[in-house]
């Protein structure tokens, strides 16, 4: 038809004419065509923004709308052009930082709209200055997985003694989440100014000691990047320090942290070494010298328990004597292992750590852990080390929900050992509420259960709830953004956590909205590479909250009371003396809440939002006489908001925390709180009818350091008197003397019902002083499948004791064994062993 020899423009004209001719022919001809013209598809209306572009000094919430019926709106906030793959609009968009918002509308039967764009310059007020912290309760802990935080020294990325375990793309595009990625102690040191800017009180670093040096898994790699597969607890891992496994990088980190007023908490593993039958086969070294492997551990006094994997995590015997996930399970009551583990903790203390997070304490021998706490309580240390005066802070991991069978055991363990717990029971509710949008009543019910107080006599109540370590994300569970929280949800969770009772812990990267949802976001995908260290709306919020914790003792040490609640709204109050902080959170994404009937301890007056509306908060007016139920004038609590109202006032002597909570006479303790006065008053210990004043080595308005006086062992209280005012009586457990672990075994037990437990009680406080209740007696005794009973108890070294076993029945009644009391003399050192037969 055509000869193709035209230029590009000419060809376009010819083809257009040809197309028109073919169209006319298909319509039945030329000028006589009477068919309708082609239909033109209309374009959807351009989206409208509820807030005009411009500069603002408060947080803005922008609603999007479109006049096209049934339109869907997609938007971006990162400067990219929106498409149908962008975020689908569902609720007003909170803006707390300068943002360019772009939106596109789509609708069935319409072409996509034009893109609407608006730039919002948000210049929020600077956060208040953060005062110097005298106690960890006044700030928050920042948890770091060292390998995933920052690479500060590339020379240790692929060390020769453990070559081939490094992914060079880990921080950019990881190929293997089980390899080392390069984060190290030098990297944390180099980011100290970032941590200080947020008001971090302490960093909790993953175990820094030497881990296995070979692949312990299949070809895809299994390494100890996380720190929980130790081989030598006396050396620093070469990936975190240097090839000499020296302490230089660790010491540098501690020095830098202390210079910025930040404490260092080391994660410590006492339960196990490393995988059995793979890698290094449960290798155990002592400062470079091989002690044993799992397979060669065949002596008369084995270092390990050679037992099956735990199959029932609510079985007391399995937990303490079986194997956790094929990791070589240390026998803490082997005398060498006992001294090795305690020596490793003292070694870390001598290198400047300020406390420990104890891994898997539910799976370690419970009775031995009492003696480990006592060893740390009796550590004297160098006066140049902060932990020598502000005593080491201990907390441990016991995964248990309040509805689980061993929850009462966990409460008893914490109350009587002096080891604080990670508040896992509260965590489960926080993950539900902020991650899965469940009702706030879950949190409130949990707090009511846990915080009933030691005087309640219930097996559910913690003696010192303000010592529990709280969190909503960690390295073992999916981050709440994976569970469903958006950025505002994370900030609301932060707001709750940092104003709730307890010592709050933020997981690294939460402030940068870090998450990876692969595999449900659990291990290892919750151990992401830290991608940013910049300031944003979340770091600003943290600064506000850190300043509040530091400045107002009600948040660090006060009581906590629910004031108003429904599924989406939680209003609660912290109080210490005349210091009051009232917090209101509305997590509903679209509905404001009318608040009526709210009472408060805040004095009458008008209160602006402490957060300066950076979380969409509002002001309130309090009326009535000063008291516990001052009415708040009805007000509207905005959706997706957090409001905080603060009153700062006087406070008499008030004890918030004692560290440690259990110690023997002669040990040093730190009493923290407020209102102690600048001049020394009187610090008193009361046990039974006896009250003895303690000699204070340090006295300030918020902290006292003193030596436990010679006083009767057992449950005691501590008070501070300043002038005519005396503080609350804080619970304290006085140990008789230095403790060591003793294995008590009993054979010939009577037949037991499903609700029976075997307990031990005896002649000293550490054996229960002949008490018979669940909380008073010692135990329950573990029941090996081979028969009999086994229980490790930490008792006074060198003591002569008497004791008996008893059966505590489900109805509270007791059956003692018959006959005379058993007698034993406890050795002066090491580990004791006492075996008896049940007396019928």
Residue ranges and their predicted role:
Residues 2, 15-46, 124-126, 130:
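Bacterial Sec-dependent N-terminal signal peptides
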Residues 133-140, 147-351, 371-384, 389-407, ...:
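Substrate-binding/active-site clefts of carbohydrate-active enzymes
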Residues 649-680, 725-737:
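Beta-strand/beta-sandwich contexts
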Residues 81-87, 750-800, 808-827:
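Aromatic-rich carbohydrate-binding modules that target alpha-glucans
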Residues 93-99, 710-714, 796-799:
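Surface-exposed, short loops/turns at beta-strand junctions within beta-sandwich domains
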Residues 253-262, 272, 343-350, 354-464, ...:
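Active-site-proximal helices and loops of the catalytic beta/alpha 8
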Residues 36-126:
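Short, compositionally stereotyped local motifs that mark structural "simplifiers"
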């Amino acid at each position: 038809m055509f000869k193709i020899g035209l230029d590009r423009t000419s060809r376009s004209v010819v083809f257009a004419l040809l197309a028109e001719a073919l169209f006319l022919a298909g319509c039945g001809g030329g000028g006589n065509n009477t068919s309708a013209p082609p239909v033109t598809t209309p374009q959807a209306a351009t989206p409208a923004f509820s807030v005009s572009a411009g500069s603002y000094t408060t947080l803005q919430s922008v609603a999007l709308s479109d006049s096209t019926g049934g339109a869907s709106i997609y938007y971006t906030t990162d400067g990219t052009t929106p498409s149908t793959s962008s975020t689908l609009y569902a609720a007003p968009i909170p803006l707390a930082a300068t943002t360019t918002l772009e939106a596109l509308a789509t609708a069935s039967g319409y072409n996509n709209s034009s893109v609407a764009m608006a730039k919002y310059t948000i210049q929020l007020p600077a956060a208040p200055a953060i005062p110097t912290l005298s106690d960890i309760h006044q700030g928050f802990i920042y948890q770091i997985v060292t390998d995933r935080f920052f690479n500060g020294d590339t020379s240790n990325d692929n060390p020769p003694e453990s070559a081939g375990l490094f992914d060079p793309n880990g921080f950019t595009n990881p190929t293997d989440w089980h390899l080392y990625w390069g984060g190290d102690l030098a990297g944390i040191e180099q980011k100290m100014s970032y941590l200080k800017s947020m008001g971090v009180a302490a960093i909790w670093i993953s175990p820094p000691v030497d881990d296995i040096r070979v692949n312990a898994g299949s070809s895809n790699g299994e390494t100890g990047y996380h720190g929980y597969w130790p081989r030598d607890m006396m050396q620093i891992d070469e990936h975190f320090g240097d090839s000499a496994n020296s302490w230089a990088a660790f010491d540098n980190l501690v020095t830098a942290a202390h210079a910025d007023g930040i404490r260092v908490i080391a994660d410590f593993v006492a339960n196990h070494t490393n995988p059995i039958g793979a890698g290094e086969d449960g290798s155990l070294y002592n400062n470079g010298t091989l002690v044993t492997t799992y397979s060669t551990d065949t002596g008369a006094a084995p270092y390990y328990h050679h037992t099956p994997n735990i199959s029932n995590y609510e079985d007391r015997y399995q937990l303490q004597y079986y194997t956790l996930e094929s990791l070589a399970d240390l026998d803490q009551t082997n005398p060498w292992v006992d001294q090795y583990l305690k020596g490793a903790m003292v070694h870390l203390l001598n290198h400047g750590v300020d406390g420990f997070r104890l891994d898997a304490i539910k799976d370690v021998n419970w009775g031995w852990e009492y003696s480990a706490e006592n060893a740390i309580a009796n550590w004297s240390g160098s006066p140049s080390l902060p932990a020598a005066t502000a005593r080491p802070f201990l907390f441990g991991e016991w995964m248990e929900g309040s509805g689980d069978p061993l929850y009462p055991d966990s409460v008893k363990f914490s109350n009587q050992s002096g080891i604080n717990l990670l508040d896992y029971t509260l965590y489960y509710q926080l993950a539900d509420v902020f991650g899965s949008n469940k009702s706030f009543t879950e949190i409130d019910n949990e707090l009511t259960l846990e915080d009933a107080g030691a005087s309640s006599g219930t097996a559910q109540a913690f003696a010192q709830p303000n010592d529990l370590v709280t969190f909503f994300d960690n390295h073992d569970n999916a981050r709440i953004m994976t569970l469903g929280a958006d950025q505002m949800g994370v900030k609301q969770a932060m707001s709750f956590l940092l104003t709730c009772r307890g010592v709050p812990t933020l997981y690294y990267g939460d402030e940068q909205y870090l998450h990876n949802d692969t595999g449900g976001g659990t291990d290892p995908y919750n151990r992401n590479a830290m991608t940013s260290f910049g300031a944003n709306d979340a770091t600003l919020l943290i600064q506000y909250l850190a300043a509040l914790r530091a400045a107002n003792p009600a948040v660090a040490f006060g009581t906590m009371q629910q004031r108003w609640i429904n599924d989406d709204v939680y209003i609660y109050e912290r109080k210490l003396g005349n210091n009051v902080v009232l917090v209101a959170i509305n997590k509903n994404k679209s509905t404001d809440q009318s608040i009526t009937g709210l009472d408060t301890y805040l004095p009458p007056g008008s209160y602006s939002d402490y957060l300066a509306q950076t979380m969409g908060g509002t002001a309130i007016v309090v009326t009535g006489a000063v008291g516990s139920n001052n009415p708040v004038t009805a007000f509207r609590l905005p959706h997706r908001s957090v409001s905080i109202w603060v009153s700062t006032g006087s406070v008499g002597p008030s004890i918030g925390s004692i560290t440690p909570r259990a110690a023997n006479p002669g040990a040093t303790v730190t009493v923290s709180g407020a209102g102690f006065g600048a001049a020394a008053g009187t610090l008193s210990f009361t046990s039974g009818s006896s009250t003895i004043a303690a000699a204070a080595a340090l006295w300030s308005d918020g902290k006292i350091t003193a030596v436990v006086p010679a006083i009767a062992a057992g449950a005691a209280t501590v008070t501070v008197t300043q002038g005519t005012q005396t503080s609350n009586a804080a619970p304290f457990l006085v140990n008789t003397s230095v403790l060591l672990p003793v294995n008590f075994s009993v054979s010939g037990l009577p037949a037991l019902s499903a609700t029976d437990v075997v307990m031990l009680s005896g002649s000293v406080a550490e054996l229960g002083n002949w008490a018979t209740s669940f909380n008073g007696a010692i135990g329950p005794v573990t029941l090996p499948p081979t028969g009999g009973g086994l229980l490790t108890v930490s008792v006074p070294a060198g003591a002569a004791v008497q004791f008996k076993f008893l059966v505590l029945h489900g109805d509270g009644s007791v059956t003692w064994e018959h006959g005379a009391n058993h007698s034993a003399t406890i050795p002066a050192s090491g580990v004791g062993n006492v075996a008896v037969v049940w007396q019928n």
